[in-house]
Design a protein with these regions (language model features):
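Lectin-like carbohydrate-binding module/patch detector with strong preference for beta-trefoil
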Residues: 1-183
């Protein structure tokens, strides 16, 4: 499309202002919901419980659980969130550099979350963020009806993190708050 503007200087006079051809009008840059950086991710069921790598394991398939924060420097509870565009994010462990993931052969309720090395833009490693009152939903891009979830809506030491049907914008088992980490 080619656009031109006319400047009206009087009722009978118009001046055409040449413009550069463009395929689309300029738009405002997209601002992501979450700024890239390191965060603590907390359940809104109990703000004393954080997303945690079980036993601080750097291994593939390390279990992701809830645990209380025992040090601001604990890399097992620090997550690097990186915006990929359109409010899609990778969530990477500061401990190992591995990504929050799940088994894509079983995109179903109760599928546990674990760490896995980055691989081929796997949909299990890309999370769509949605801002809701009190925090964020993170649903998988493999199936937007499945969200990051606290098993049994029970915030306690070692509680499994899983995917589960997204069932309410007020379901605290699926709403996560973010706190910037300085580490």
């Amino acid at each position: 499309q080619i656009w031109s503007l006319e400047k009206i200087t009087s009722a009978n006079e118009a001046t055409t202002i040449p413009t550069t051809p463009t395929s689309a009008p300029a738009s405002t840059p997209f601002k992501p919901l979450i700024e890239d950086g390191n965060y603590y991710i907390k359940t809104t069921l109990n703000p004393n419980f954080y997303l945690d790598v079980a036993f601080s394991s750097p291994a593939d398939y390390a279990k992701i659980q809830l645990y209380s924060q025992w040090s601001k420097e604990n890399k097992a509870q620090i997550w690097n969130i990186k915006h990929l565009g359109s409010n899609k994010y990778q969530i990477k462990s500061a401990l190992s550099g591995k990504l929050l993931s799940f088994n894509t052969n079983h995109v179903s309720n109760n599928e546990p979350i674990f760490l896995l090395s980055e691989g081929n833009n796997n949909c299990s490693q890309v999370w769509q963020a949605e801002q809701v009152e009190g925090g964020f939903f993170f649903h998988t891009t493999c199936d937007e009806t499945k969200a990051l979830d606290v098993n049994g809506a029970y915030a306690y030491y070692g509680t499994q993190i899983q995917i589960w049907d997204k069932w309410s914008k007020t379901n605290k088992a699926q709403i996560w708050s973010l706190e910037k980490s300085l580490f």
